Design a protein with these regions (language model features):
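Short loop/turn segments that connect beta-strands within beta-propeller blades
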Residues: 38-43, 79-83, 145-149, 187-191, ...
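Beta-rich, blade/repeat-based domains predominating
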Residues: 8-22, 50-69, 92-110, 135-140, ...
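Loop/turn-rich, solvent-exposed surfaces of beta-rich toroidal or solenoidal domains
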Residues: 181-182, 197-236
């Protein structure tokens, strides 16, 4: 069953389930740029106005929020009350361009995708530039020490709009490359490999492709297909195993509820969060204690 549990949102993006059953979500639109908490009834509370173009979110074991693409394209750590605790602006190689999605690993470190292009270079008059595919992307995947607030290393570079990121039950890292339709898999510190090609052709004329990622407990990967109006299911061998249609065409981020029974989807065409009954229970996220 698919139901809408939050409406009136403006470019809803990253979302994450909390231990008490609520979920947190960020809105990218310039009129919002905020972090909100939602309960199961859809009632919400705005925690803070972050600034920037908040895109991704993760929560640690201290209950603090990590938000990708805060002011000046930064990664920001916020207290449960929304107070800024830490700001990370880049690596030794230079500043971040457009931080996108976040996931804590089994090692307690934080992993982040950077789309590889500044939003100002991607947009024209508030809309996607018609020549977006020809832009000079350098999408990256970063390994970050959250305690020290520094980038440890770059795990991947040169990606065409790096987007979603997730770990499977075996600790392997997965991340999506939206414009090519690829989802990559990687042992931390090892070589990148193609896990699945989710589209038959690259996104040349319309921004579309794999975005947010999440795993269920059986190892199936759930991949939000932005611009295509569906969640693709991929089995452990990298084969397409099914599709779940969304009500809108632009699903971006996905997350399982804390009990694992439902999938939450932020959908930008209608400005909503959709709640979908999960075929199988979701895999719990890593939430390490930092302080």
């Amino acid at each position: 069953m698919d139901e809408t549990i939050a409406t009136g949102l403006r470019l809803p993006s990253g979302l994450v389930a909390l231990q008490d059953g609520r979920f947190a979500l960020v809105e990218m639109d310039t009129s919002r740029r905020c972090l909100k908490l939602f309960d199961t009834s859809g009632a919400h509370q705005e925690i803070c106005r972050i600034g920037g173009s908040p895109t991704g979110i993760a929560i640690d074991g201290d209950g603090c929020f990590w938000v990708a693409d805060g002011p000046e394209n930064s990664l920001v750590r916020l207290s449960p009350q929304g107070r800024v605790l830490q700001v990370i602006e880049g690596s030794a190689d230079g500043p971040f361009l457009h931080p996108n999605a976040l996931a804590f690993g089994p090692d307690g470190l934080l992993y982040m995708t950077d789309s590889g292009i500044r939003l100002d270079d991607l947009l024209e008059g508030g809309r996607i530039h018609p020549d977006f595919f020809k832009a000079a992307y350098n999408g990256c995947v970063y390994q970050i020490d959250p305690a020290d607030g520094r980038v440890i290393r770059v795990l991947a570079a040169g990606l065409l709009f790096a987007s979603g990121i997730a770990f499977d039950a075996n600790g392997l890292l997965y991340y999506s490359e939206t414009l090519t339709g690829k989802v990559h898999r990687q042992i931390i510190g090892g070589r990148q490999e193609l896990f699945v090609q989710s589209m038959t052709s690259p996104a040349i004329n319309m921004l579309r492709g794999p975005s947010g990622l999440a795993f269920d407990r059986s190892g199936v990967l759930y991949c939000a297909m932005y611009g295509l109006g569906e969640i693709s299911l991929v089995d452990t061998e990298g084969r397409m195993a099914g599709h779940i249609r969304t009500n809108g065409t632009r699903p971006g981020s996905i997350a399982f509820t804390i009990d694992g029974k439902h999938l939450l989807v932020s959908e930008q065409e209608n400005g909503v969060v959709e709640k979908i009954t999960a075929p199988r229970p979701g895999l719990p996220l890593h939430m390490p204690t930092i302080s």
